[in-house]
């Protein structure tokens, strides 16, 4: 049976160890996180706020971990959705620490993009477009942070990063195209309230449409020959 008491993991590795030690099923993770937050509520001990702020970082890492699995299943998606709710509540309780966690991830993604572009935007081995885990993280940013503000500590660098992806990454495969289209959908969601125009997203959509039309035209000509 599921224990009622758990330690409060201070890192993602500690969280994975806890889940493995107690043989926690994906369907039980939401309950485990709820119990950890209850057992380590900030009003129960002076050190608990610090514990929960570290736990927040572990939960963010676990979302990326689940989304980045090679064989992501429906269980993983349910876990991600459950964890986003916990992250949202903890981010509202500790906004400064939450912002630090998110900005650190955004900075790392931007560094990886620059390193990939340095290899050459068309190099098949260059990591330019975000992977599934990174797309899940950007979606979480759009859901959790106010994207209509003129300037925001998390949302502004997120907007700039998505614009960089769309402006500088080049489509080399259908996977790249899917990443580009999903980024455009995130941009649309993020700018729905402010109604800002993002030229990088419009240009990316135009380029993708042109590529698809070219492929369709090529197949049509091949079929007639």
Residue ranges and their predicted role:
Residues 1-10:
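Acidic, serine/threonine-rich intrinsically disordered low-complexity regions
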Residues 10-17, 162-167:
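Short amphipathic alpha-helical segments and their helix-coil junctions
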Residues 62-225:
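Eukaryotic nuclear macromolecular-assembly scaffolds and interaction domains used across chromosome biology
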């Amino acid at each position: 049976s599921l224990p009622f008491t758990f330690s409060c993991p201070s890192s993602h590795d500690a969280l994975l160890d806890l889940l493995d030690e107690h043989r926690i099923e994906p369907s039980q993770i939401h309950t485990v996180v709820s119990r950890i937050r209850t057992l380590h509520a900030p009003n129960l001990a002076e050190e608990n706020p610090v514990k929960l702020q570290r736990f927040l970082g572990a939960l963010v890492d676990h979302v990326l971990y689940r989304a980045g699995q090679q064989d992501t299943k429906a269980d993983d998606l349910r876990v991600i959705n459950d964890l986003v709710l916990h992250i949202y509540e903890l981010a509202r309780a500790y906004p400064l620490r939450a912002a630090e966690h998110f900005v650190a991830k955004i900075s790392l993604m931007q560094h990886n993009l620059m390193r990939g572009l340095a290899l050459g935007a068309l190099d098949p081995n260059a990591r330019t477009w975000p992977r599934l885990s990174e797309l899940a993280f950007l979606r979480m940013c759009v859901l959790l942070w106010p994207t209509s503000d003129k300037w925001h500590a998390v949302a502004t660098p997120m907007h700039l990063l998505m614009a960089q992806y769309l402006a500088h990454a080049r489509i080399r495969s259908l996977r790249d195209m899917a990443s580009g289209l999903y980024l455009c959908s995130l941009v649309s969601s993020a700018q729905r309230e402010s109604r800002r125009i993002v030229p990088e997203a419009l240009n990316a959509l135009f380029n993708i449409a042109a590529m698809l039309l070219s492929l369709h035209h090529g197949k049509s000509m091949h079929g007639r020959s």
